[in-house]
Amino acid sequence: MMIKIAVVLCAVMATSMVFANDVKEQELADLLDLLISEEVSSPDDAVAESWGHKLRSSWNKVKHAVKKGAGYASGACRVLGHSPQEARAKVLEAFPEMKESDLDEEQVGKYCAVAHAIHGR
């Protein structure tokens, strides 16, 4: 049962790290080695503590990457304009190859609202 939980946690963490573009191959290899080791199948306090530290560390990296990305998006929304209409117009002006149907004012407003909410502004 412990192995199944560890496999699921490892898969979730690896997926999160890949989507956050903050993945280092060595970290994933270390997690996999830890998963495969005999210590995981019968963890004692030291191994459980080590696992907890690795998971917390990985989670903090993902959280930091998401917050950093939201900060960039929030800043971009502020630079582009205060209203979704202004932001949409500026994006379409900057990227003439983009079709108007690709960028809806509602979408721009939602993206900016989410970025501001995550970033805390």
From Swiss-Prot:
Q: List the disulfide bonds.
A: C77-C112
Annotated GO biological process: defense response to bacterium; defense response to fungus; killing of cells of another organism
Positions modified as Histidine amide?
H119
The root-end lineage is: Eukaryota, Metazoa, Echinodermata, Eleutherozoa, Echinozoa
Work out whether the entry's keyword set contains Disulfide bond: yes
List UniProt keywords, sorted A-Z.
Amidation, Antibiotic, Antimicrobial, Bromination, Cytolysis, Disulfide bond, Fungicide, Hemolysis, Pyrrolidone carboxylic acid, Signal
User: Signal peptide: which range, if any?
Assistant: 1-20
Query: Could you tell me the superkingdom of the organism this chain comes from?
Result: Eukaryota
Is-annotated flag, keyword Disulfide bond?
Answer: yes
Subunit: Heterodimer of a light and a heavy chain, probably disulfide-linked.
What is the species listed in this Swiss-Prot or TrEMBL entry?
Echinus esculentus (Sea urchin)
- Where are the 6'-bromotryptophan residues found in this chain? W51, W59
Q: Which residues carry this modification: Pyrrolidone carboxylic acid?
A: Q107
Residue ranges listed under propeptide: 21-50, 83-106
Q: What is this protein called?
A: Centrocin 2
